[in-house]
Swiss-Prot record:
This is Protein adenylyltransferase Fic. GO terms for cellular component: membrane. A motif (Inhibitory (S/T)XXXE(G/N) motif) lies at residues 248-253. Its EC number is 2.7.7.108, 3.1.4.-. Disulfide bonds: none annotated. It is a single-pass membrane protein. TPR repeats lie at residues 123-156, 157-191. One of its GO terms (biological process) is protein adenylylation. It comes from Drosophila ananassae (Fruit fly). ATP binds at residues 252, 333-336, 384-391, 416-417, 424. The lineage of its organism: Eukaryota, Metazoa, Ecdysozoa, Arthropoda, Hexapoda. The chain crosses the membrane at residues 38-58. Belongs to the fic family.
Amino acid sequence: MGATDQALEAESKTTEPPKTPPVPEQHDRPFLGRQANLCHLLVLLFSGGLAAITLHIFTSSNVGWRLRQLHHLPTAHYLQTRDEFAVYSVDELNAFKEFYDRSISDSVGSSYSEAEETNIKEALGALRLAQDMYLAGKDDKAARLFQHSLALAPRHPTVLLRYGEFLEHSQRNIVLADQYYFQALSISPSNSEALANRQRTADVVQSLDERRLESLDSKRDALSAIHESSAALRRAKKEAYFQHIYHTVGIEGNTMTLAQTRSILETRMAVDGKSIDEHNEILGMDLAMKYINASLVQKMEITIKDILELHRRVLGHVDPIEGGEFRRNQVYVGGHVPPGPGDLALLMQRFERWLNSEHSSSMHPVNYAALAHYKLVHIHPFIDGNGRTSRLLMNTLLMRAGYPPVIIPKQQRSKYYHFLKLANEGDIRPFVRFIADCTEKTLDLYLWATSDLPHQIPMLIQSTSEAGEGVPQLQSSQMGGGASIPEFHESGSGSLP
């Protein structure tokens, strides 16, 4: 090799570029990028899914909570108390109503437990047998079988409908029949039979209710025509005062007899063998009644403060710390869960507005008073004394309309609570009729005691166990000391025999 060739070879070696590391194949770069993007995407999807699950749980719990709050409010019924009490806006209520209606429909078609299935099968069997007895003309046996079927399946639409039809056509009790049709319709809103039955009975029942109220007005007017100076009227008022306190504390479980109640109120002396609380319950009712007579009857409007003052006197001797104060804890009343303490202020403000509204005051006094009673006891604003305060408020409204304070007999305690339960389930009319019945019996007591009638009528005096205790009893203006008002029985009609 020549010198020139060697020089060129050396030059080529010196000018050769330095070797670089091998470059990865082109398909490796996108793979690494895709791997990173996939990780980012997975993280994003996981975060989004977690957020969605959290939002779903929050929304579901919030809807469930709001629906549970709606359970605190009276359901839609004849007097539409839920709308008047609503804590929420109309849009919220409409939205929740869809969930509420759907939950009712689902509950009707939901699976039953084994015990419930057994009861339903037995109830339907008894129902078929009852219908056979009815068609055979054996109404007494049919009635017992219908009642047995209802006891086994009290919320089965078919049982309610068949028993209602039996009451309507065989027993001629269209009012109670309509009540069962209403209940069946509330459980199964699309039930065509229930709709048809209600269309047939609703107007008739409403007319009967209105005529009943007119009858009460007539008796009230007859009582108002008696001059205040009448000695018989004064005696009747005094006796009714003792009875009212005796029965209203008796509903709450007080075991004092009428004679003992009278003795405590007249002498302020303790009764042996009875608890201090039972004495104090009677004294508290006495204070509350005097407050009504001195202040509330003359007032044009009833305020929250008035209700608190009423309650303060009811519990004044039993629990002076809680008296006149809204409760600060959640309470439970049987199957009813009243609103939480945080809702009480708003609910009571709305109740006060309803209580003094033109719409409410234009109702018949008995309807107005009964509904006020129900609304207040449904809110259950106090830790104790809600029933007594609600009954006192009811009587305040009745007294402002010229009625005497209504006596709800403690012997009818179970009926009283049953009708409140029916009102919670959607139909307040049975409770209003119950109050109307007690109003009529109280009016009859006054009219009989101030009349010259030589005969007696069922009255509200005492339980059978107290008969013969030497309790002073009402006497008519014509009767001698040997004649007294007999015991009141739950089945009494309240009308003159």
